[in-house]
Every structure is written in structure tokens, then in C-alpha cells.
Regions:
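Metallocofactor- and cofactor-centric catalytic cores in central/energy metabolism, strongly enriched
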Residues: 1-215
């Protein structure tokens, strides 16, 4: 039997750039796969997380989010900025994104390896910096999003993601919801359908009248 959320999926998209070379991007990809597997295996999330790769340029950002908009199964995107300043690749084309957005402003590690930390580690693990810049640019673009507080392995953080997923699923389901209004005015007339038209543009639901107000 299909469960309520089986028809949906949430994409996981990692932001990076080629400033530190291909080896860094390979490491970013490995960390991203580790996080996605951990989130799916946690048992806390109602919707499956699907890793959609690392985006390293504005063209890749645009292509990925355009694909998300056109995929009926995708109800939202989890963004994670792994390296230094991936948000520079987010431009005006990102403003057309229709999917729900959440971001994980935390490094893949839960602690800091003080004994072994070097510049390679510092250059690679800059989520705190990258996600702050991402938050800055999407705020300037007036894009609403959920910011998850806490490490991705923490139960509290996973519960935040789960709640966001449920809201995103409800919104997606409402886009083709049929609402029947009783005792309404004339149907399919621009003037009398004004309120119904407003509701449709606001929540995406189809307002339909079956029983007229005249008795």
C-alpha cells in the first residue's frame, strides 16, 4: 500500500566551486552522499531525500532548479553550501525557483578536529561561511526558506527537516486540490469568480461551483 508521502521526493543540492580544484569537489560529493544516506536512514523523515549532485556554476544552478520546478515528484530542495562562497553562482535566474527551500548551515563533521586540522581542511569545510553567504543572497532576492538549526545528525535538526517536508508536501498536494463551494454565484464568470480566482492564484486550488445560490 502506498503511503501518503511515497509519491514525493526532496532533492539535496550541494553548492561548491572549482576554486580549490577537482579533488575538493570529489570530497564534497562524498560528504554529500554521506549526509543524504544518513538522513534517509535516520527514520525521522517522511519524504525520501535524493542527492542531485554538486553545482559549481551559475549554469548548473539554473539547470538543477529548473529541473526541480519541472519534476512533479520534487516538492522541495535542501541546499548545502560546502565550500567558500558558492552563493556567487546564485543569480537572478534563481528567483524563478518555485520549490520550497531549506538550508543546512553546518559542516559535515559534528566536531572540529583540532589536532589534525590544516589549511586543506579549512578550505574544504566552509559551510558556515558558504551558507551564511547563501542566506544573504537569497534574502536580498526575497526568497523565503527554512533554515535548519543544528547538526544534520541531531534529532532536533532532523525533526525540523521533517516538519518542513510535511508543509512542502501539503503545499504540493494543494496545487491540484478541488474545492467545492455551495450556495455560490454564477460559475465561470469573471466578475462573480473574482474571489475564487484570487484563491487559485494564492494556493493553486481549483474553485468549482456545483450548487447555485438560487433556490
Amino acid at each position: 500500500m502506498e503511503k501518503a508521502f511515497d509519491q514525493y521526493e526532496v532533492w539535496f543540492v550541494t553548492g561548491a566551486q572549482l576554486l580549490y580544484g577537482g579533488d575538493a569537489v570529489i570530497a564534497v560529493d562524498a560528504h554529500s552522499n554521506e549526509m543524504v544516506k544518513g538522513l534517509n536512514d535516520s527514520g525521522k523523515l517522511p519524504v525520501k531525500v535524493v542527492y542531485k549532485g554538486t553545482v559549481n556554476s551559475s549554469k548548473e544552478v539554473t539547470a538543477t532548479f529548473k529541473a526541480a520546478n519541472n519534476d512533479d515528484k520534487c516538492i522541495g530542495v535542501i541546499t548545502w553550501m560546502h565550500t567558500f562562497s558558492p552563493a556567487k553562482n546564485v543569480d537572478s535566474r534563481f528567483a524563478g525557483t518555485e520549490e520550497a527551500i531549506t538550508t543546512l548551515p553546518y559542516t559535515v563533521q559534528q566536531g572540529i578536529p583540532w589536532e589534525t586540522m590544516d589549511m586543506d581542511f579549512m578550505n574544504l569545510n566552509q559551510s558556515a561561511h558558504g551558507d551564511r553567504e547563501f542566506g544573504h543572497i537569497v534574502t536580498r532576492m526575497r526568497k523565503n526558506r527554512k533554515v535548519v538549526v543544528g547538526h544534520w545528525q541531531d534529532e532536533k535538526a532532523q525533526n525540523q527537516i521533517a516538519a518542513w517536508m510535511r508543509v512542502a508536501a501539503a503545499w504540493a498536494d494543494a496545487q491540484d486540490m478541488l474545492i467545492i463551494r455551495f450556495g455560490d454565484q454564477m460559475n465561470n464568470v469573471a466578475v462573480t469568480d473574482g474571489d475564487k480566482g484570487q484563491r487559485r492564484t494564492s494556493i493553486g486550488a481549483i474553485m468549482w461551483t456545483t450548487i447555485p445560490s438560487m433556490m
